[in-house]
Amino acid sequence: MKKITTVLAIFLLTALGAQDFKYGVTGNFHQGSIVGVHDVSKGKFGAGLGGFIQFPLVQNDVFDSAWLYLMPQIEYNMGGEWARAEEEKFGIQKYTHDYVAMQVYLKYFFNFGNMKRDYFVFAGPRIEYLVRQDKKVDPAYDAAYYKYNLDDEVAKFGYGVSLGVGIKPTSRWEAFMRFDRGFSKVYPNNNLRNTYNRMLAVGVNYYLNENWW
């Protein structure tokens, strides 16, 4: 909880200290999974919802001509995966890991001949804190596969990178595709493999304030 409070404080201080900033809400639909564990595992579909602020790192004007931005973002994100090892015998094993996550993106709009385009790319570090964990697993599966999974403990805190591409068709709406890749272990007791989160998402951003002035 202290880590969540710290992240929220950083987010708010950044917003208050920024000049000419925009803010809005973001949502995504994604497929996520945990790499290196649960044998025949399949990605789990989920959603994410959050908010962002965005302010220019280069000179801007009333026409919103800046092409480089810093964009902190915080969101609630549903993760985990489904395991299907020997499905006819054990059924489907369901692992739910929900996170409060924060990304700090560097966002670049393509520009040619001093003309800002509608297409952009973004990338930045990501941190996440586990706020909900649920496990619906056949005890017989656990007994047979624990020696491979070593998944009795789930890390509360994680970090990684997030990157993507997008388009801004109007002054208020953006659509994007995003990939997140964790660098920290989801299951710290698993010394056989690097068990990390990954996610592929499509989503939209909606700006609540349209103008810079």
Model-derived features: positions:
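Positively charged n-region of N-terminal signal peptides that target proteins for export
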Residues: 1-4, 19
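Sec-dependent N-terminal signal peptides
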Residues: 4-14
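Residues that define the transmembrane beta-barrel architecture of outer-membrane proteins
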Residues: 19-21, 41-47, 96-102, 157-161, ...
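Short loop/turn motifs that connect adjacent beta-strands in outer-membrane beta-barrel proteins
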Residues: 19-21, 58-68, 111-118, 210-213
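Glycine- and aromatic-enriched membrane insertion/assembly motifs of diderm outer-membrane
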Residues: 22-24, 30-33, 40-92, 174
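Residues on the lipid-exposed face of transmembrane beta-strands in outer-membrane beta-barrel proteins
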Residues: 25-29, 49-55, 74-76, 102-108, ...
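Flexible, solvent-exposed loop segments that connect beta-strands
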Residues: 34-41, 78-98, 131-155, 185-195, ...
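Predominantly the C-terminal beta-signal and adjacent terminal strand-loop region
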Residues: 73-75, 79-82, 151-152, 161-162, ...
